[in-house]
């Protein structure tokens, strides 16, 4: 390949479903490599399978790419020099090249019926050999072809595969050898007149001047067919890079259902696009200095497809299935099930926490607002990017957030107006053992103090511990339940300064009364 050519990569999804994990990684790798090389990233829609392609899916794919921050330089909505960028609008182009291949005897019409082909496949299976089309109609005379056309016999068009050894020098997988005799004459135009995947992709990539084809390793087997077509059409062959297989926590290939999770589900679960982009980039690629958390904009500068590994990449977002289970989720369109199945110690959560901590507070607040919209337990005036209360709370709690969807429950803790103890277990922390003593002592010391900062409150609780002889769980749990009604939540020294002394005293008075603990001696 001419090394001086502008790098041009592409992502070419079929609009027949969501943009899933594997597709998102492919799009991202192509986008990042083009950007890092000062090149162009092209989006093309492969909708030649008219039975499966839908307008809704097309819109969702565009929405998903935009959320992920993968912006195309040419493609739908913006056009470009080499359009149209939707395959169903390029049928005349494919027809022109098909006529060329037929004229040069590099392709031929195949009049075999589906039933005949199925019978040949079954015969090969019975013999225990791979099925390879036998080229029955490869050498028909022009007269024989014309006769069948007059009879309006349906046909497909097959490429006449030359017998040779092909060596694919893949950027990621290395040198891979293919024997074309095991491929046989393959279909390039289906009986409905639409081009096959392998044919359309070659014509499009060639005419759109694609220099690098970056995709999942599952497409490696398509590569020899595509190279043969490039040669037959006399086009320069692009460089190929087949990214590693993605596996789950159990080391097995990511299941179709888990792998088909829409990336928009992660948006709806509170993950920022910066985080998800960072995580997806690490599925098969490493930076030259080994860093994993990469600031916004850096991936576009440093990504190099030559640093991708061919070893399987672990998608650790979901927990490992238990023995006997195939899935940790039975419905991957159910956000609740997805959330419950997620691995709390995943790299995605680690990156997400880092992102939320480091991001400008204004960006965090802007991204958070949609998660507050329907919460009745948070005052309307707080659901505002300019709210001082919201800013203070998020500044204090963001170090604890793995995703923004966790924030509303924490925020709501600050605005409880009718505090009640949430469970029998929580009540037990207040009433059992030295719980009442701890609650009374905390109330008394707080009433006679004027704490303002988290350090003030830490000192105050230490003093309660000294007086009562309690520490750890037996000290903090009674205080937590007395002030929040719950046995889990934010760290108390963070919560208390934001609530303030008076609100804390009111809360303790209410929960103590509910638990039957007298505060006066």
Swiss-Prot record:
Recorded hits in SUPFAM superfamilies, A to Z, give: An anticodon-binding domain of class I aminoacyl-tRNA synthetases, Nucleotidylyl transferase
Q: Where in the cell is it found?
A: Cytoplasm
- Asked whether the keyword Aminoacyl-tRNA synthetase is assigned, the reply is yes
- Report keywords, A-Z: Aminoacyl-tRNA synthetase, ATP-binding, Cytoplasm, Ligase, Nucleotide-binding, Protein biosynthesis
- What is one term from the GO cellular component aspect held by the record? cytosol
Q: Does the keyword Cytoplasm apply?
A: yes
Q: Where is this motif: 'HIGH' region?
A: 13-23
What is catalyzed by this enzyme?
Answer: tRNA(Glu) + L-glutamate + ATP = L-glutamyl-tRNA(Glu) + AMP + diphosphate
- Binding positions (ATP): 256
State the source organism's domain of life.
Answer: Bacteria
Subunit relationships: Monomer.
Please give the HAMAP family that the UniProt record associates with this protein.
Answer: Glu_tRNA_synth_type1 (MF_00022)
**Record function comment:** Catalyzes the attachment of glutamate to tRNA(Glu) in a two-step reaction: glutamate is first activated by ATP to form Glu-AMP and then transferred to the acceptor end of tRNA(Glu).
Protein name as it appears in the record:
Glutamate--tRNA ligase
Protein's gene: gltX
């Amino acid at each position: 390949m001419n090394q001086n050519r502008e790098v041009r990569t592409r992502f070419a999804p079929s609009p027949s479903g969501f943009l899933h994990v594997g597709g998102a990684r492919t799009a991202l790798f192509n986008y990042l490599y083009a950007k890092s090389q000062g090149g162009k990233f092209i989006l093309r829609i492969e909708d030649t399978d008219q039975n499966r392609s839908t307008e809704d899916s097309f819109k969702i794919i565009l929405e998903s790419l935009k959320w992920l921050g993968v912006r195309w330089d040419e493609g739908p909505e913006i056009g470009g020099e080499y359009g149209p960028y939707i395959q169903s609008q390029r049928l005349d182009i494919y027809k022109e090249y098909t006529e060329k291949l037929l004229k040069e005897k590099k392709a031929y019409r195949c009049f075999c019926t589906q039933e005949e082909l199925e019978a040949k496949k079954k015969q090969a299976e019975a013999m225990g050999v791979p099925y390879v089309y036998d080229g029955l109609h490869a050498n028909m005379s022009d007269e024989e072809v014309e006769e069948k056309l007059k009879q309006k016999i349906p046909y497909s068009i097959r490429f006449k595969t030359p017998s040779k050894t092909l060596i694919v020098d893949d950027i990621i997988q290395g040198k891979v050898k293919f024997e074309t005799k095991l491929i046989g004459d393959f279909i390039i135009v289906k009986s409905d007149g639409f081009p096959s995947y392998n044919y359309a992709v070659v014509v499009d990539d060639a005419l759109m001047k694609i220099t690098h084809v970056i995709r999942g390793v599952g497409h490696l087997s398509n590569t020899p067919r595509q190279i043969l077509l490039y040669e037959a059409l006399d086009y320069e062959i692009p460089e190929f890079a087949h990214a590693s297989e993605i596996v789950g926590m159990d080391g097995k290939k990511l299941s179709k259902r888990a792998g088909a999770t829409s990336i928009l589900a992660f948006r709806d679960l509170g993950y920022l696009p910066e985080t998800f982009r960072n995580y997806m980039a690490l599925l098969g690629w490493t930076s030259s200095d080994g860093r994993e958390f990469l600031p916004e904009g850096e991936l576009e500068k440093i990504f190099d497809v030559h640093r991708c590994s061919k070893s399987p990449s672990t998608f650790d977002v979901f927990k490992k299935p238990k023995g006997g289970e195939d899935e940790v989720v039975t419905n991957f369109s159910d956000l609740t099930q997805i959330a419950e199945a997620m691995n709390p110690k995943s790299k995605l959560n680690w990156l997400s926490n880092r992102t939320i901590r480091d991001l400008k507070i204004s960006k965090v607040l802007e991204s958070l607002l949609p998660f507050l919209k329907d919460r009745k337990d948070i005052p309307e005036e707080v659901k505002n990017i300019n709210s001082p209360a919201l800013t203070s709370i998020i500044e204090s709690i963001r170090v604890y957030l793995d995703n923004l969807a966790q924030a509303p429950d924490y925020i709501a803790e600050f605005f409880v107006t009718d505090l009640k103890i949430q469970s029998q277990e929580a009540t037990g922390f207040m009433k059992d053992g030295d719980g009442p003593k701890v609650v009374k002592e905390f109330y008394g010391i707080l009433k006679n103090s004027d704490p303002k900062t988290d350090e003030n409150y830490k000192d105050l609780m230490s003093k309660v511990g000294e007086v009562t002889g309690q520490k750890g769980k037996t000290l903090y749990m009674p205080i937590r339940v007395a002030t929040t009604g719950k046995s889990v939540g934010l760290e108390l020294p963070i919560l208390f300064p934001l609530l303030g002394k008076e609100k804390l005293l009111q809360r303790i008075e209410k929960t103590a009364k509910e638990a039957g603990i007298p505060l006066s001696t």
